[in-house]
Regions:
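Phosphate-bearing ligand-interacting subdomains
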Residues: 33-85
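Glycine-rich hexapeptide-repeat left-handed beta-helix
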Residues: 1, 53, 116, 125-128, ...
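Glycine-rich, N-terminal phosphate-binding loop of Rossmann-like dinucleotide-binding domains
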Residues: 55-57, 98, 187
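Glycine-rich adenosine-cofactor-binding loop
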Residues: 1-18
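Hydrophobic, well-structured mid-protein blocks that either form specific transmembrane helices
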Residues: 70-123
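NAD(P)-binding Rossmann-fold cofactor-contacting core
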Residues: 21-36
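Short alpha-helical
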Residues: 9-12, 60-61, 173
Length: 188
């Protein structure tokens, strides 16, 4: 059995991928209170068998659920159209969507989302709970900190380091290193 924690569009995408690649029963779970106050995650952890995937696009909420669920049976979800170097081992709970390309030497942390048609070039490092938006491009040697969001169509130039919990706007071009907690957008 596979348990999807989440609802909405991203959970539907994950369900679609799993339906094509797994013959196991798929169950949906969510708790409306995770955005405000956490529900009874011990019930989920102790009483529900099978593998888990957290299908929540918001990095902070995904991390909160992972910490509270505390389950160590997370699966990685990869669409069969993604092109991934044979030596890449994404962290548990990570999700690699349709048409993404991930090159040699890249390290992907736990519970990352690499969205539709994103390109992650050689030797990149993606921190836990990071999000790479649709059609975003990370050039070679880029480092993305934990919990950082890279918006749709953004480009991060080679060997740039972006700190933890940053927000890079859609269509932006990142040309210099950014410290933790920065919101950046635009194209120089």
């Amino acid at each position: 059995m596979i348990n999807i924690y989440g609802k909405g569009g991203h959970a539907n995408v994950i369900n679609s991928i799993l339906s094509q690649t797994h013959s196991k029963q798929i169950n949906f779970w969510n708790d409306e209170s995770y955005e405000k106050e956490v529900g009874d995650f011990d019930h989920y952890n102790n009483n529900i068998k099978g593998d888990w995937i957290i299908a929540i696009g918001n990095n902070k909420n995904r991390k909160k659920v992972a910490e509270l669920l505390g389950n160590d049976c997370y699966i990685t979800v990869t669409h069969n159209s993604a092109i991934i170097d044979a030596n890449i081992n994404p962290g548990e709970g990570s999700q690699i969507l349709h048409g993404s390309v991930i090159q040699v030497g890249t390290k992907i942390g736990k519970h990352c989302i690499i969205n539709t048609a994103a390109s992650v070039d050689h030797d990149c490092i993606l921190g836990d709970f990071s999000f790479i938006g649709p059609n975003a491009t990370l050039c070679g040697g880029v480092e993305i900190g934990e919990g950082t969001f890279i918006g749709a169509g953004a480009v991060v130039l080679p060997y740039i380091k972006i700190g933890k919990n940053c927000m890079i706007g859609a269509g932006s071009v990142v040309t210099k290193n950014l410290p933790d907690g920065i919101t950046a957008y635009g194209n120089p």
